[in-house]
Regions:
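Pan-zinc metallopeptidase signature
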Residues: 2-5, 9-27, 199-254
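Juxtacatalytic substrate-recognition/specificity segment
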Residues: 31-150, 154-155, 236-237
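Flexible glycine/proline-enriched surface loops and loop-helix/loop-strand junctions
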Residues: 124-128, 156, 194-198, 210
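Sec-exported extracytoplasmic/periplasmic mature domains
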Residues: 66-70, 148-157, 174-182, 214-222, ...
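Surface-exposed patches in mature extracellular/periplasmic domains of secreted proteins
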Residues: 65-81, 158-164, 186-190, 223-231
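Post-HExxH zinc-binding segment in Zn-dependent metallohydrolases
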Residues: 155, 162-198
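Extracytoplasmic/secreted proteins, especially bacterial periplasmic and envelope-associated proteins
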Residues: 53-56, 60, 64, 138, ...
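Membrane-water interface at transmembrane helix exits
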Residues: 22-25, 29, 153, 157
Length: 254
């Protein structure tokens, strides 16, 4: 019995040590990235040299972030380009190297981005295939999307992912990230015919979530603060989407 208790004690101690080490590594990842550039409100780190076109990418990120009425003064972010996939797996929040980008919204303002062609403002998709909705989702989209998550977390609490529905968290980040490059009428048409592109489980895209947020912000006149303070239920959102189909404005726009 004493042996078992001693073993359990060592296991608990080892687990705590590993956890503390991991938190330390992810909170202060800079030593694992050799290249650094500072531009405006961004500190950029990478495991490869950073081309000068990063300034164009970040200017476009800031253009997209203007879409957020939650954006305040002095929003500073650290961006880490993980060209080696193991870095994205380790530092991202999902222990996966398949994501486009990820962000730590609870402790830091760190954004982790997969291998990218910075000069061309695009990420390199997992597996080397084509990126869905690539025209609307350049590299600057992914950075702005994750920055939007951080902005929301600073406004409404570090554990927002546990407080709000997925459609709101990802829909708002997609709304901000796309910087206005979203055809509401076309996506609403796809929604009405039950297109797989509007179903996140089928497409992996946030179009359906974005449509909900765009309806509230652009058609119903809500502010982002109002949505996050009083998020509509799924049933309420479905009712609003259905009602919009029969509204005079909707009829005029189709």
């Amino acid at each position: 019995m004493k042996y078992v208790l001693k073993l359990l004690k060592y296991l608990v101690l080892a687990s705590v040590t590993i956890l503390v080490a991991y938190v330390g590594m992810t909170t202060f990842p800079e030593p694992m990235f050799d290249h650094r550039v500072v531009y405006r409100n961004y500190e950029i780190w990478s495991d490869q040299s950073i081309p000068p076109q990063i300034s164009n990418v970040l200017d476009d990120v800031n253009r997209r972030l203007v879409r957020s009425d939650l954006q305040g003064e002095n929003k500073k972010f650290k961006i880490f380009f993980c060209n080696a996939s193991w870095r994205l797996w380790l530092y991202g929040q999902h222990f996966s190297d398949q994501v486009g980008a990820d962000a730590d919204t609870a402790v830091t303002r760190n954004i982790y981005v997969r291998a990218s062609d910075i000069a061309s403002n695009r990420i390199l998709p997992p597996g080397g295939g084509d990126l869905a909705d690539a025209a609307q989702r350049p590299l600057s989209y992914f950075i702005a999307h994750e920055a939007a998550h951080i902005i929301v977390a600073r406004q409404f609490g570090r554990l927002v992912s546990f407080r709000y529905p997925e459609w709101l968290m990802e829909g708002y980040a997609d709304y901000v990230g796309k910087g206005g490059d979203f055809d509401f009428d076309e996506n609403y048409r796809l929604f009405r015919i039950h297109s797989p592109q509007m179903d996140f489980q089928q497409s992996g895209l946030y179009r359906g979530f974005h449509l909900r947020v765009a309806l509230l912000l652009d058609k119903q006149g809500w502010t982002a603060k109002q949505i996050f303070e009083h998020p509509p239920s799924d049933n309420a959102m479905n009712a609003l989407l259905t009602k919009f189909a029969t509204s005079p404005k909707s009829a005029d726009s189709h």
